[in-house]
Amino acid sequence: TGTVIDEAGIPVIGANILGKGTTNGTITDMDGKFTLINVPENAILVVSYIGYLDREIPVAGKSTLEIRLKEDTQKLDEVVVVGYGVQKKVNMTGSISNVKADDLSVIPSTNLSNSLAGRAPGATITGNSGLMGAKSEIRMRGGFGDPLFVIDGVIRDKEAFDLLEPYEIDQMSFLKDAATASIYGSAAGNGVVLVTTKGGTKNQKPIFNYQGSYAFSKPTQELFADRWDAIDDLDYQNAVARFQGTPLPNGEEEYAYFRDNKINYNVNDYIWQNPWNTKHSLSVNGGTDKVKYYVMGSFLAEEGSYVSLENKKFSLRSNLSVDLTKYITMNVNLDANQSNDKRFYWPFSDDDDQSVYDLYRCTFNAMKTTPFYSYLDGTPANTITDYPIYQDYGSWQGWNPVDQVVGNRYLKTRRRNLNGIVSFNINLDFITKGLSTKVMASYLGHDYNRKRFMTFQKNYKFQQADPQGNRFLPAPLNLNEYNTFNFSQNYENLEYKTKQLWTEQFNWFVNYANTFGKHDVAAMVVFEQASNGGEEVSAKGESPLTNLDQMFNYSSDALRRWGEAKEKNGGRLSWIGRFNYTFDQKYIAEFSFRYDGNTLFPDGKRWGFFPSVSAAWRISQESFMEPTSDWLSNLKLRASWGKLGNNSIGNYEWQALYGSGYNYAFNSNKSNGLAMTTFSNYALEWEETAITNIGLDFGVLNNRLNGTIEVYDKKTDGILYRPTLPESLNQFTSPLQNLAGVNNKGLEITLGWNDRVGDISYSVSGNFTYNKNKVTKYKGELVREWRTDANGKKVWYQNVGTVANGSSNLIVEGHEMNEYYMMNPYKGNGSYFNS
């Protein structure tokens, strides 16, 4: 028997007692006591508990033991990544969600954002497309756009974030309130995601780690296109005829033809496959007493559910740290990656848009009574041939959905990124204790190449052997009866697009941290300067001589050749500060600010000041809480307020823009000219968000059960939006203006349990997020008045003609974003209209 207590003599409830090398074990009761039978005199007991250091106790013939556990100070000193540094978790005053990299590495996802669903309270992860390679959308606390992504201290875009491998991540933090995010000022209006990558370990021999996986997906139920067969098509065609009062097109002869011959032309037989992906990574880390290194290379390949979808990704990372002297450490980080994508060309969505839902719709609706391909003699083919057969789709006459996926037209993209970071950490303790400085420089290069090959479809007409009888009996093809489907394009074409972008960033840090008795103080001041620019070139050729996908194959006529070039540049300058004060490890206060200047805005509007204040009270550390110390491990109340900005706009949005093609004839001679296409707006300024956050952190049973409850109020004003211009100005694009405001309020709850049984550790966690928004400013309030419907009946019409143009999900003051509006029926009249 025995008792397990902590350093203060308080019983430890639920501690694990296990005979070393055996399965003989037990746990302590509510008084910290335990009883273990069948224990040899020379046995060694292993005593463990979450938050305490393990102990091995020799029994040595004793029948009663008192075991004292020491707190694991490493747990107490756990730090989390914050803006421009790290902080002890127990001293945090703001709202941060941390995601463990180990939790992400077990998910067979091909990009990082898809792995985050449900793992970061306050962050909503939404998949917008099932297309291979499609990225999920990340929205934090009702934000309108992507959060700011910062990787190893350098601002990056979401593409770079998604290219990260879980294996190379050390820590990931979601900064959700102003206390944590305002230090990023004008770019933090939609929240901040911080990532630090892994480094090496001093005095460690090289450790190699290989991670490999193969994953595939298979439908758990029958696809919709497989459920509907040719008989269903015949029934549907007859039902339409009955509704229209016309003769039925299908009789027993047609039904017998498909039923008895088991004929069913299924689009999925041609284009569908079970998607798969394979991932491989190899890393090595280690170090000496002065050098630490971490190197990782990875490869990903995947194919989508359609046969012409391919994606490959290559990544390389090298993180090196060298102690040059006793006081100076140099860090060199290098990150390079490349992704190659290929898919069928779909002209009705943007080239980089992963949503091709209208193609899905067309494939689902493909008729089962007409073959997709045939041989020259008219025999329907179960494979791809040179004779695609067209199907009629309402206004899309003469189209073949299978040929769109498996045909020769395509879209290829290649993206490459190179990021180099060099920093020097200088310890200035020889001047005064706790003083240090750091300088950091980074260069980011990005290039994007896209090749788009577009050809028309040439589809042949299905020939009927018996037009007066069974109209589905095939006859030999007539090669003179075909349809050319041009996808609303005038000419077949080939287009190239290339972009080269760069960003340079320089930071200078001055840090100070010290303790004076019960007073802990810390301060940081940062100067940051960044510049960016890039060039974009596009070229297009039309009217090819053959089907070869090379530019020399296209017409040299100047009217059939097209080219465009753009360039951009900009810069930003910032002063950043953070000051922390803690008294007696109970009372914590923090003030931070960022003073931002950015060329995205006009003179006089370029600078913005974004402060935040926050405080926390560690209630569990108070003397009056001692009676609860045997079960209450942590109780902390915190509150924060601050302002954030949003600069997610393009270059030159405030300037008047001009375009070519506006010509005039002088004396019968054509003169080329330029004309204004976008109005200027010299009043354009920062979109600002003020956030108030109150949180309660708690832990019981030595933090085996822990959680957080938070409420927030997020008010955004000056939201950038393009107003609708009068018809008389239809040649112009309206400038961005600060027109709208939105208020988001919400609740977040996180609850987790972690424990250990013998050598097995386990944890369970869950989170709940609720967010409700209301439009506080947008073109005026909703107007209600009586109107009549198409039948002359009175309806209560919600008139929103001044705030939107016919959409059923609208933005209206006093209502939620994108609410759906319908007419209230009047006296049973079931008519409704999109307001």
Kindly label every feature range from the protein language model:
Residues 209-259, 756-835:
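Conserved small-residue
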Residues 104, 145, 313-315, 319-328, ...:
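Extracellular/periplasmic, surface-exposed regions of secreted and cell-surface proteins
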Residues 243-263, 278-279, 351-400:
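Acidic, glycine-rich flexible loop segments
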Residues 13, 36, 55-56, 157, ...:
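A sequence-level detector of short linear motifs
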Residues 1-317, 329-331, 337, 393, ...:
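Short, small/polar-rich motifs associated with maturation and membrane association
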Residues 4, 19, 27, 148-151, ...:
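Hydrophobic beta-strand positions
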